[in-house]
């Protein structure tokens, strides 16, 4: 049969599939309807039956599912004129489940109802994407299909219900000490399955289902008036998924119970991380829906006050967030919800911010990278940017358009803080360095709140406090940390009160900004802050006993390691100095152990190296050196010369007695590590576990807060020094010769790299430089530069 020929749609029209009744052994068939979207009519009822109902001109159900990695279309739906629409296996499974045995069903599915193939320049696709918020809002129900029965699904759903029942206690973000969350839940009856229990495997397999991280499902789920979730043959209450995700996302015991490091590679770690990302994705989607309904608004908090609050021994349950409370509020708010949906309003309490959404959804996936941006437009009301699919609207063009829009709206600090060069060897096809890489998938565990963003958050809190919107801590008193935060106007203020000054050149895609240069980078230490405090301290103390701002060098050092802030973005309390000393002691022990392991490994390897030198033919050594050069030539400068020297000295090595050869090899190994490849050696040393910051399990209790702040920085920055003996946390791609400068209107400095073109620079990324973060150099001479 021939393929179905799509007919053009009029403005405001969509297609619907009228799926005819079908038994499992019958082919799927139906017809395509053209339907003009109209808001439903709200009918209130006097009796308490859930707030009334919506009357639709044509009731239909919208489908939310994961397309799957297999894009082949071996199945089809027979359309009434004898043609067919070819569909993927995943959509075929969904339609089979939804086909009624005794009557038709009207459905909307993107792969069928949008002409994504033959429309000119994908124009229709862009137009229909703009209608998708209304498509899902007006649908009588949204049918969510999470996937087929697999991986002990029933066991996973049972465990999810158990976690959801104790979610308030298991949610570590609700407690001052996250490590106590599981203990609190266990005191109230929660049973933590032992290591090796099949429930862990089943739960993590469920969390890894791709629907939870498909970027398009966000608006599909949030806009839905009513949702039905199925997985395999099971109906799933999405509220339980939300409660489970809230608990799992921040509870280290739930995340890592049963984890053991991989002997080779990171496969096992990746499985655990993917499960955590699934929980994070589920939390983002369900939380956005909850807040669109009014979750955590004053009305919700009044209705949900915990009358048993005084009987609890912690502050996390002042507002109830259990299943019954959530559903009670939904029943209370349903009349307003239905009325708002009939009026075309989905976000009566305010739309999400686009930049915030881009941060929160960094771990979501899309088949086309540009959809990471387009799929969020319908949630934020960014009407002036339209989804256009054409050869001219490349990903770089679209991303630059988004960045320029945010900057002109006053968010330059936040845009630049997430931007920077993409690799050590930039390509001519790269977008401008001042445009963030919003389409790169980043694990939420690898995300951090940047230095500029932290200052923005502090500004927002101060604004709320000035408006009288900030609430005191429980008991009517503020905590010491909160009081300390109120004593400062801003956590970071490198540019002082200097206003933003910028110009966007759309033709050459450059951003001209006014900056105050600080200094030139002269040394970047390796290891991504994972070499351990003793190693870095020893290198830092070579600067002298006193830092340029007058602080003792070690105090400046430990403050720099954490960006001079707590893990949650508050000023550093005095107790952090003691916790730093405790952490230094722990890591000194780890370093000693690592060096012993290294020495033992060297002693074990020495006889084998000696035998290899004496017994392997000369041609074999030539082959080994050639392989080593081929493997390392792209990452290690000067690797060819040592290889040649080794081959020249090989006859001498063979001639020497073993008693002379062994000490000589030890001396050569030491020389190579200390003199020839010191940075490479230090970079390799981090894999021996010389820092507690790389720990996945529990952490020492006598330094938990400082270590948590330090862990935020680990693997994201390198410790570096400038010509004027300033030190700071700089982006991983920073090189000697880069420039540190303050961009006017931004809270933290940036690292920039000069280009061959005078006055043009590549943005490397934001940074923390100790001693310049509070406007100390803001009054210095400024210049205009162009970021390209």
Located regions from the model:
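Short, well-ordered alpha-helix to beta-strand connector turns
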Residues: 139-140, 225
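A general alpha-helical scaffold signature found inside nucleotide-binding enzyme cores
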Residues: 86-89, 127-131
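Fold-level signal for large, globular catalytic cores of enzyme and receptor domains
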Residues: 38-108, 113-122
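Short acidic catalytic loops
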Residues: 63, 101-125, 136, 142-146, ...
């Amino acid at each position: 049969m021939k393929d179905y020929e799509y007919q053009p749609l009029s403005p405001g029209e969509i297609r619907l599939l009228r799926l005819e009744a079908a038994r499992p052994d019958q082919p799927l068939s139906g017809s395509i309807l053209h339907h003009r979207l109209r808001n439903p009519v709200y009918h209130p009822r006097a009796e308490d039956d859930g707030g009334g109902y919506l009357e639709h001109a044509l009731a239909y159900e919208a489908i939310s599912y994961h397309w799957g990695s297999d894009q082949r279309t071996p199945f089809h739906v027979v359309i009434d004129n004898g043609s067919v629409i070819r569909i993927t296996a995943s959509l075929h499974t969904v339609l089979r489940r939804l086909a009624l045995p005794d009557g038709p069903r009207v459905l909307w599915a993107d792969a069928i109802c949008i002409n994504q193939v033959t429309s000119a320049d994908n124009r229709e696709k862009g137009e229909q994407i703009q209608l998708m918020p209304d498509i899902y809002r007006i649908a009588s129900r949204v049918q969510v299909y999470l996937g087929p029965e697999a991986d002990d699904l029933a066991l996973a759903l049972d465990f999810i219900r158990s976690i959801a029942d104790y979610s308030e206690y298991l949610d570590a973000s609700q407690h001052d000490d996250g490590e106590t969350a599981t203990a609190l839940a266990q005191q109230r009856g929660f049973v933590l399955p032992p290591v090796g229990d099949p429930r862990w495997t089943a739960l993590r397999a469920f969390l890894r289902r791709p629907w939870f991280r498909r970027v398009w499902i966000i608006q599909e789920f949030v806009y839905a008036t009513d949702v039905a979730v199925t997985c395999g043959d099971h109906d799933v209450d999405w509220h339980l998924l939300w409660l489970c995700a809230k608990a799992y996302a921040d509870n280290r015991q739930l995340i890592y119970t049963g984890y053991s490091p991989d002997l080779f590679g990171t496969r096992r770690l990746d499985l655990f991380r993917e499960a955590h990302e699934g929980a994070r994705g589920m939390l983002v989607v369900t939380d956005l829906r909850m807040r669109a309904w009014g979750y955590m608004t004053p009305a919700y908090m009044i209705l949900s006050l915990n009358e048993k609050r005084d009987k609890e021994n912690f502050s996390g349950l002042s507002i109830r967030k259990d299943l019954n409370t959530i559903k009670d509020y939904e029943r209370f708010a349903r009349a307003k919800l239905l009325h708002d949906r009939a009026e075309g309003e989905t976000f009566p309490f305010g739309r999400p911010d686009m930049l915030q959404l881009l941060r929160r959804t960094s771990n979501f996936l899309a088949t086309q990278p540009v959809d990471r941006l387009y799929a969020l437009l319908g949630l934020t009301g960014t009407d002036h940017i339209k989804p256009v699919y054409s050869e001219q609207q490349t990903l770089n063009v679209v991303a630059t358009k988004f960045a320029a829009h945010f900057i002109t709206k006053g968010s330059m600090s936040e845009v630049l803080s997430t931007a920077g060069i993409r690799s050590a060897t930039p390509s001519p096809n790269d977008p401008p360095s001042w445009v963030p890489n919003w389409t790169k998938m980043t694990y939420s565990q690898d995300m951090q709140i940047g230095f500029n963003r932290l200052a923005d958050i502090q500004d927002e809190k101060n604004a709320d406090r000035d408006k009288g919107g900030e609430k005191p801590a429980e008991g009517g008193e503020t905590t010491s940390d909160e009081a300390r935060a109120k004593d400062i106007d801003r956590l970071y203020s490198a540019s002082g009160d200097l206003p933003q000054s910028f110009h966007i050149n759309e033709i050459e895609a450059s951003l001209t900004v006014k900056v105050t240069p600080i200094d030139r980078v002269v040394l970047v230490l390796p290891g991504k802050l994972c070499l351990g405090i003793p190693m870095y301290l020893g290198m830092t103390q070579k600067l002298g006993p006193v830092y340029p701002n007058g602080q003792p060098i070690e105090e400046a050092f430990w403050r720099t390691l954490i960006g001079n802030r707590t893990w949650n973005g508050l000023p550093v309390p005095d107790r952090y100095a003691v916790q730093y000393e405790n952490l230094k002691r722990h890591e000194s022990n780890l370093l000693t152990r690592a060096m012993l392991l290294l020495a033992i490994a060297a002693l074990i390897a020495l006889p084998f190296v000696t035998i290899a030198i004496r017994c392997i033919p000369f041609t074999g050594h030539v082959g080994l050196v050639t392989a080593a050069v081929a493997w390392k030539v792209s990452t290690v400068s000067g690797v060819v010369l040592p290889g040649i020297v080794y081959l020249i000295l090989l006859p001498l090595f063979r001639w020497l007695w073993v008693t002379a050869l062994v000490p000589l090899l030890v001396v050569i190994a030491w020389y190579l590590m200390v003199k020839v490849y010191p940075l490479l050696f230090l970079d390799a040393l981090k894999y021996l576990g010389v820092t507690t910051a790389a720990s996945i399990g529990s952490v020492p209790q006598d330094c938990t807060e400082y270590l948590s702040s330090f862990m935020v920085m680990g693997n994201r920055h390198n410790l570096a020094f400038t010509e004027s003996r300033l030190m700071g946390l700089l982006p991983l791609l920073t090189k000697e010769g880069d420039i540190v400068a303050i961009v006017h209107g931004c809270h933290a400095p940036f690292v920039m790299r000069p280009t061959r073109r005078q006055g043009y620079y590549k943005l490397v990324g934001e940074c923390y430089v100790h001693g310049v973060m509070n406007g100390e150099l803001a009054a210095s001479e400024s210049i205009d530069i162009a970021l390209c």
